Amino acid sequence: MIEIIPNLFIGDQNDYESRVSRQTGWAVVHACKEPYHRQALGYKTRGAPRNHPEYLMAKRGDRLILNLVDVDDPSFIASEIVDTALQFIEDSLSNGIKVLVHCNQGESRAPSIGLLYMANKG
């Protein structure tokens, strides 16, 4: 887990499970479908039902859970997912809350969202 700017951390699933999940004072962006989006919605099929109101993302307290898979083609990623994640990060940081953005391995989805946040901030 690394801090890329003050109070914004990028990591992997293990960082969340072993370091953040049991602490208070954190907001978390789960930038991975498995297992968090599946657990939040409770679906047993390969993917979430497309007509579910939380198909793209679910918010549970200080956790934003994205239906985000690791794909090579960015056209498969809904801009609404990215926009919501960036706003969630901004809102959390503005309220003095530390934020962890994580994916399964911490090598693509989470760092990409962190870089997009930094690029948008200028």
Features from the language model and the residues they span:
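Cysteine-based protein phosphatase catalytic domain of the PTP/DSP
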Residues: 2-98, 119-122
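A short glycine-rich, hydrophobically flanked beta-strand micro-motif that places a catalytic Asp/Glu
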Residues: 101
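Active-site-adjacent alpha-helix immediately C-terminal to a catalytic or transition-state-stabilizing loop
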Residues: 104-122
